[in-house]
């Protein structure tokens, strides 16, 4: 053997050794991941006490799948990637499903979905995809014999679940007997039991009041409510169910998933009205995007969209792995709940003196953004939630909602955690904090010179929710106050070019932007000024009501509490706060300085009687071309109308733009409330309710 050959052989042996080492490392990591996933599945499915969020579980599963893809020899039949997650509790009788209840594979991006759809259509083109919302609840299997419900069971491990028949019988949406003339001899259906989101908050409040631990989320509430030894407890909870799949059946002959849903509905089973059959992959992705934007318009929590090949013949040909069908997939949305570490609890002093504790977190990505801080509301809330500094906590961020710490993961405590102690003095000005009788909030009473309150009130006045002063942000407000160029919100509209002389960071362009922003803000609607004054309890709803009814700041300032309380959306508490605010000479001086700065203190038409839309209640849903939600709302309110966020029998019109919220649109149809498109909305504003009503045709309810 030559020198070169010996060197090459040595290189090959070294490379082989490296590969063996790498394989050993990945083998160890795969075993570690398998153990972790088994433990998390047990806590989730059996104990209903998960210690990680769904997104973290999914990430661990995907890591194990990637290792097994690189090293197929590590993929064993008992790997978590090859079997249905879950098990069954020993508290209930185990029962075997007639047909296996499989899980679903997940995709998280358009590219991953395209790849899955291409595999599904490899042998035969798919001409119909059924799309439905993925409910975040508890999977349940129902068996009907001769039309009678004989058994209900949890998913368990997909083969064996827990017999929860007495508990499921208490659900109003689950029929004890199927209806209709052609009832199947045998019918096994699968569905999701869920806890309506609106009722979830009520349940947790009742549990806390009774001294019991609250549920972390609606899914846990549904699982905990179903796994009760006493069915009367289950019956007291507002559980609901939607059926979304078939198991074993005899005498139930249909050709497609959509056809099965229609037949199941005829039999009296609860089927979602929000599924759609679509022809193309792009249509499917549009459905996924649409419901991603409207996921909070649904009565239950959803964490994605399930996409199925609609044709049963194609489903049979595609078959399934040991874990999931090849003809269905779950397109998961970005997580809204994750776990992270609570590094510290600090306090923030707000514009009205309220001292609010907030959590400082290990930065974590949730709902599409990275979060490092989250509200804890007040000291009582810290106690109720039982969070300690150093805890691993469940963090929730739904859409545009402020991130919130939901609960601690108590099982992960190691003894190093410590309790939070509320400060006794304001961290900004040193004033002793007070807790007014009957209130949960602790406050700094120094409204005159507390730097935090002055800074926050100026920033709030300029914010988009108030006067929307372009260029006057938090940093600018801080500098202007610190340098003595303004002293409170009363000075803001007296800013002039010379006010910025000698200040670093204020170029001519920046100064011009602020002055233009002030000029535009001088003519904002009255309700925006009311919000900007930082009167306690006065938010947009109360401010709009006061502006609509009284039309000028002078009328509001001089009205007795009884008159203010009679305004829709106000009430005695807000009325008293308004009276108290205007009774303070310092506040009257602030208003006088705002007025002398050229700000309009009355809406157009003040004192002229009712507006043209007086008594008209409008709900706006979807996107209106040329209108933001705020400007559309102001257009209605400036004419005396009222805009609300939910449809009821009191609603006069529902204005539906592009991509309207399904729940509002459907409820309008059910209640036969006139629907207006953008053209109809323009007629409503220009010509009034009668003219708009003539254009709008009440939607008829099918059937």
Swiss-Prot record:
Single GO term (MF): DNA ligase (NAD+) activity
SMART domains: BRCT (SM00292), HhH1 (SM00278), LIGANc (SM00532)
Cofactor list: Mg(2+); Mn(2+)
Every BRCT domain range: 608-698
UniProt record, GO biological process: DNA repair; DNA replication
Family annotation (Pfam families): BRCT, DNA_ligase_aden, DNA_ligase_OB, DNA_ligase_ZBD, HHH_2, HHH_5, Nlig-Ia
Gene name linked to the record: ligA
Keyword field: DNA damage, DNA repair, DNA replication, Ligase, Magnesium, Manganese, Metal-binding, NAD, Zinc
Name of the protein: DNA ligase
Protein's UniProt keywords contain DNA repair: yes
Residues that, per the record, bind NAD(+): 54-58, 103-104, 132, 155, 192, 308, 332
Active-site residues from the entry: 134 (n6-amp-lysine intermediate)
């Amino acid at each position: 053997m030559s020198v070169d050959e010996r060197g090459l052989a040595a290189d090959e042996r070294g490379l082989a050794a490296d590969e063996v080492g790498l394989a050993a490392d990945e083998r160890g990591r795969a075993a570690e991941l398998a153990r972790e996933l088994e433990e998390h599945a047990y806590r989730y499915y059996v104990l209903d006490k998960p210690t990680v969020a769904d997104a973290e579980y999914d990430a661990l599963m995907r890591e194990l799948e990637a290792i097994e893809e690189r090293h197929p020899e590590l993929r064993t039949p008992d790997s978590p990637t090859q079997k249905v997650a879950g098990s069954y509790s020993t508290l209930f009788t185990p029962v075997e499903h007639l047909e296996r209840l499989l899980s679903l594979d997940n995709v998280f991006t358009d590219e991953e979905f395209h790849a899955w759809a291409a595999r599904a259509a490899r042998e035969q083109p798919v001409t119909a995809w059924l799309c439905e919302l993925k409910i975040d609840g508890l999977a349940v299997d129902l068996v009907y014999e001769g039309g009678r419900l004989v058994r209900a069971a949890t998913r368990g491990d997909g083969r064996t679940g827990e017999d929860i028949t007495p508990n499921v019988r208490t659900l109003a949406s689950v029929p004890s007997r199927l209806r209709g003339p052609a009832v199947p001899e045998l019918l096994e259906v699968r569905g999701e039991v869920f806890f309506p989101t609106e009722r979830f908050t009520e349940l947790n409040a009742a549990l806390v009041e009774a001294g019991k631990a609250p549920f972390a989320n609606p899914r846990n509430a549904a699982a905990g409510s179903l796994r009760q030894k006493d069915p009367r407890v289950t019956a007291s909870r507002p559980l609901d169910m939607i059926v979304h799949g078939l198991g074993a059946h005899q005498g139930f002959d249909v050709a497609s998933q959509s056809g099965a849903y229609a037949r199941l509905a005829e039999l009296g089973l609860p089927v979602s009205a929000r599924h759609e059959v679509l022809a193309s992959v792009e249509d499917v992705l549009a459905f996924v995007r649409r419901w991603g934007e409207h996921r909070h318009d649904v009565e239950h929590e959803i964490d994605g969209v399930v996409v199925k090949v609609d044709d049963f013949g194609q489903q049979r040909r595609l078959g399934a792995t040991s874990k999931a069908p090849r003809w269905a997939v779950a397109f998961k949305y970005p997580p809204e709940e994750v776990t992270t570490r609570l590094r510290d609890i600090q306090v923030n002093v707000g514009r009205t003196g309220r001292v609010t504790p907030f959590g400082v977190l290990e930065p974590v990505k949730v709902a599409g953004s990275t979060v490092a801080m989250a509200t804890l509301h007040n000291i009582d809330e810290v106690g109720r939630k039982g969070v300690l500094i150093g805890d691993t906590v469940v963090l929730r961020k739904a859409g545009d909602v402020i991130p919130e710490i939901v609960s601690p993961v108590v099982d992960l405590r190691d003894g190093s955690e410590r309790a939070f102690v509320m400060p006794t003095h304001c961290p900004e000005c040193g004033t002793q904090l007070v807790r007014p009788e009957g209130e949960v909030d602790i406050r700094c009473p120094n409204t005159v010179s507390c730097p935090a309150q002055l800074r926050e009130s100026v920033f709030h006045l300029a914010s988009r929710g108030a006067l929307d002063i372009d260029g006057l942000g938090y940093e600018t407000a801080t500098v202007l106050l610190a340098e003595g160029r303004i002293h409170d919100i009363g000075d803001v509209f007296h800013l002039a070019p010379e006010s910025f002389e000698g200040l670093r960071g204020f170029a001519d362009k920046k100064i011009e932007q602020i002055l233009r922003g002030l000029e535009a803000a001088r003519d904002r609607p009255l309700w925006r000024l009311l919000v900007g004054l930082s009167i306690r309890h006065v938010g947009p709803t109360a401010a709009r009501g006061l502006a609509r009814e009284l039309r000028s700041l002078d009328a509001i300032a001089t009205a007795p509490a009884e008159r203010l309380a009679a305004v829709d959306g106000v009430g005695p508490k807000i009325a008293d706060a308004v009276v108290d605010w205007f009774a303070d000479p310092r506040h009257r001086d602030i208003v006088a300085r705002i007025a002398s700065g050229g700000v309009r203190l009355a809406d157009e038409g003040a004192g002229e009687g009712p507006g043209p839309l007086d008594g008209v209640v409008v709900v706006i849903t979807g996107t209106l071309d040329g209108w933001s939600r705020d400007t559309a709302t102001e257009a209605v309110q400036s004419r005396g109308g009222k805009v609300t966020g939910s449809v009821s029998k009191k609603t006069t019109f529902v204005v539906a733009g592009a991509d309207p919220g399904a729940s509002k649109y459907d409820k309008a149809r059910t209640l036969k409330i006139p629907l207006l498109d953008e053209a109809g909305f323009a007629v409503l504003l220009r010509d009034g309710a009668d003219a708009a009503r003539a254009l709008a045709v009440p939607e008829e309810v099918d059937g």
